[in-house]
Amino acid sequence: MASEFKKKAFWRAVIAEFLAMILFVFISIGAALGFNFPIEEKANQTVGRSQDIVKVSLAFGISIATMAQSVGHVSGAHLNPAVTLGCLLSCQISILKAVMYIIAQCLGAVVATAILSGITSGLENNSLGLNGLSPGVSAGQGLGVEILVTFQLVLCVVAVTDRRRHDVSGSVPLAIGLSVALGHLIAIDYTGCGMNPARSFGSAVLTKNFTYHWIFWVGPMIGGAAAAIIYDFILAPRTSDLTDRMKVWTNGQVEEYELDGDDNTRVEMKPK
């Protein structure tokens, strides 16, 4: 673990997560700010709200796809603690790198939200993209929504980035971006769609409002962990040997292996 800490590539990856997170949050939350959703649901207002939801969803999805294409080769472009946790559990990164990524993501989100706070200071009712529960949505329901939308995102990420596969066609960043957009189309009306604890953290810090903030950490982390475990142990199994996993978690990324067609085969993992 100490040897990885000294590598330049390690710090380049952490810096890439920080900078890409700033751009992602600035673009996506910036697209959402200024939309004053009406209280009364008249016909023309409902159409306007639907259009705004599509705008925000596309902004989140396209910005993630853009950042993934830009820095994916440097850091993997996680840009989400839930994705980082999923990659950790599927033995794609070490524990040290996961911790540093999450710190970088949270700091990047705070910086981006602070920039937006200055730029949009003249907006009325400026929530800075703060996540919260819609009227009539309970904490348990909101938690369930966050778990499910993050589950589909992390399942997509670990599946399309599985280096043992050779059947992935098309653009991987685009697939992940569409998954992010899909999650927002589903969840915006219920929770504002967190699906990303760091993104939610930035807004909560700048607005000093942590009401129900735990939902936007617990939900995505449960969803991300569940997706990685189900993919890694059921859908496309690797080794179940804890010793091998511990070596990867302490020494870094694993080598590439072929995904055997036999459902009963476990793929051995070794640290580089």
UniProtKB/Swiss-Prot annotation:
Keywords: Glycoprotein, Membrane, Repeat, Transmembrane, Transmembrane helix, Transport. CDD domains: MIP. It is found in: Membrane. Residues 1-17, 72-97, 161-168, 237-272 are cytoplasmic. The chain crosses the membrane at residues 18-35, 53-71, 98-119, 140-160, 169-188, 215-236. Belongs to the MIP/aquaporin (TC 1.A.8) family. NCBIfam families: MIP (TIGR00861). Forms a water-specific channel. Aquaporins contain two tandem repeats each containing three membrane-spanning domains and a pore-forming loop with the signature motif Asn-Pro-Ala (NPA). This is Aquaporin FA-CHIP.
